[in-house]
């Protein structure tokens, strides 16, 4: 219902910074679209990561509310850190958006396998080359939705997360009787 609709409404623009590169500056980043034999563009990779993160949020919600909340909070921090970089940006000075996802290393094995954080670690885009004000607005809109989602699940503690408790009981049973 409502949580699903909110997740779907997220732009997750934190994962698609190249969408905000100014047309007049695109040539500077043309090599991002041609890495040897790989025909997948940087924008294509970013869109793929954005889709994976949307799916990841839905998967987390289905698996456990606690896991979902942790993922929401990590994305919140990533966006808040990026917004802070934008807020202190002075257009008269050069400032790159370096490793904007580097601090977000606490994803679980599923996230690591998908290399969801590669965009910020591999690509550096100068904020001066971006329509950073539009990006800032999109990031703020996502942050509001994430804050709402976290608020909606805040009262559900791990002790009251039925799916998590079932999983813990299954694990305890397997430990007590290791052979099926």
Name each model-derived stretch.
Residues 1-180:
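Helicase motor interdomain insertion/brace
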């Amino acid at each position: 219902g409502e949580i699903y609709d909110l997740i779907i409404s997220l732009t997750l623009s934190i994962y698609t910074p190249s969408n905000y590169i100014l047309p007049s500056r695109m040539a500077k980043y043309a090599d991002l679209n041609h890495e040897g034999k790989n025909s997948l563009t940087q924008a294509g990779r970013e869109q793929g990561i954005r889709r994976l993160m949307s799916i990841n949020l839905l998967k987390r919600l289905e698996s456990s509310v606690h896991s979902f909340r942790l993922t929401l909070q990590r994305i919140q921090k990533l966006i808040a850190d990026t917004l802070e970089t934008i807020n202190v940006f002075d257009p008269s000075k050069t400032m790159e958006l370096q490793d904007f996802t580097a601090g977000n290393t606490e994803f679980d094995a599923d996230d690591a396998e998908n290399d969801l954080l590669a965009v910020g670690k591999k690509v550096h885009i100068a904020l001066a080359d971006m329509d950073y004000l539009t990006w800032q607005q999109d990031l703020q809109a996502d942050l509001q939705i994430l804050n709402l989602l976290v608020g909606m699940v805040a009262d559900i503690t791990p002790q009251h997360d039925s799916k998590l408790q079932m999983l813990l009981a299954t694990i305890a049973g397997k430990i007590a009787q290791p052979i099926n």
